[in-house]
């Protein structure tokens, strides 16, 4: 991997972490079209660095919210910040359970299945289209909604289902305010990213990585900057009901994937 590869992969990670296009689905499509060996090899350490960069970009964009949450928690009272934190924890449970118990099985079943990815992208397109047409409200995410949104995040482990698309769409379709839905969606994944990073660090596999520091630094900066742009842009798009743009994109790519699968 060279500097150019690091920049490209960093930008892709930064954009697809927030834009509702399914990074896992695009990765599977890229492998199918280019072949596994045509893609640059990513070390585990490089992947961890990119995820850390996007998590950090989320914290920067929502720095005011994060500060208020921690300030509220330090008061040790049953306040709005404590309730929001509990909702985040509830939303994490389905993905944690599925990730710990079924991640390898899901990869074995659906990894490389382009036809499946195509149909999942069509589902993502439908969710985004429906959410885009939903009326905006002032409703906050409830505890029940937090769990349902968490279930949609767990389902988004399937290649082709966008995590941000599934969680934001589910939240909006449950009647929640669009801006609050985007905020909840992006904040709920941060603890999971840090948890995954901690798991990888404890595995000891990172010690075997030989990735050059300049590659890591370049990838980090690219992912961080792309993440800042994508996260801010996505919030604006949700506010302005522009999710239909991504619905059309996912529909076209999903249809192309299905045609490609049958043509093989």
Curated annotation (Swiss-Prot):
It is found in: Cell membrane. Its EC number is 3.6.1.27. The keyword Transmembrane helix applies. The chain crosses the membrane at residues 42-62, 82-102, 109-129, 146-166, 184-204, 215-235, 243-263. It is a multi-pass membrane protein. The keyword Hydrolase applies. Keywords: Antibiotic resistance, Cell membrane, Cell shape, Cell wall biogenesis/degradation, Hydrolase, Membrane, Peptidoglycan synthesis, Transmembrane, Transmembrane helix. GO terms for biological process: cell wall organization; peptidoglycan biosynthetic process; regulation of cell shape; response to antibiotic. It catalyses: di-trans,octa-cis-undecaprenyl diphosphate + H2O = di-trans,octa-cis-undecaprenyl phosphate + phosphate + H(+). Bacitracin is thought to be involved in the inhibition of peptidoglycan synthesis by sequestering undecaprenyl diphosphate, thereby reducing the pool of lipid carrier available. Belongs to the UppP family. Catalyzes the dephosphorylation of undecaprenyl diphosphate (UPP). Confers resistance to bacitracin. This is Undecaprenyl-diphosphatase. It comes from Christiangramia forsetii (strain DSM 17595 / CGMCC 1.15422 / KT0803). The lineage of its organism: Bacteria, Pseudomonadati, Bacteroidota, Flavobacteriia, Flavobacteriales. The gene is uppP.
């Amino acid at each position: 991997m060279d500097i150019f590869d690091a920049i490209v992969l960093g930008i892709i990670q930064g954009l697809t972490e927030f834009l509702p296009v399914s990074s896992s689905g695009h990765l599977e499509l890229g492998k199918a079209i280019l072949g596994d060996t045509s893609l640059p090899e990513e070390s585990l350490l490089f992947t961890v660095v990119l995820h850390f960069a996007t998590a950090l970009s989320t914290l920067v964009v929502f720095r005011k919210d994060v500060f208020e949450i921690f300030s509220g928690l330090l008061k040790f009272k049953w306040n709005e910040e404590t309730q929001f934190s509990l909702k985040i924890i509830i939303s994490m449970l389905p993905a944690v359970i599925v990730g710990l118990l079924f991640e390898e099985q899901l990869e074995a079943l659906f990894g490389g299945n382009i036809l499946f990815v195509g149909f999942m992208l069509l589902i993502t397109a439908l969710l985004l289209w429906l959410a885009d047409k939903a009326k905006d409200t002032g409703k906050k995410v409830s505890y029940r909604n937090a769990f349902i949104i968490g279930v949609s995040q767990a389902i988004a482990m399937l290649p082709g289902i966008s995590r941000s698309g599934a969680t934001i769409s589910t939240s909006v379709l449950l009647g929640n305010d669009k801006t609050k839905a985007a905020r909840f969606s992006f904040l709920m994944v941060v603890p999971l990213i840090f948890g995954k990073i901690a798991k990888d660090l404890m595995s000891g596999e990172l010690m075997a990585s030989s990735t050059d520091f300049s590659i890591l630094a370049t990838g980090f900066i690219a992912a961080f900057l792309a993440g800042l742009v994508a996260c801010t842009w996505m919030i604006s798009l949700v506010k302005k009901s522009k999710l239909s743009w991504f619905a059309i994109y996912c529909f076209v790519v999903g249809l192309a994937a299905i045609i490609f699968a049958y043509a093989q």
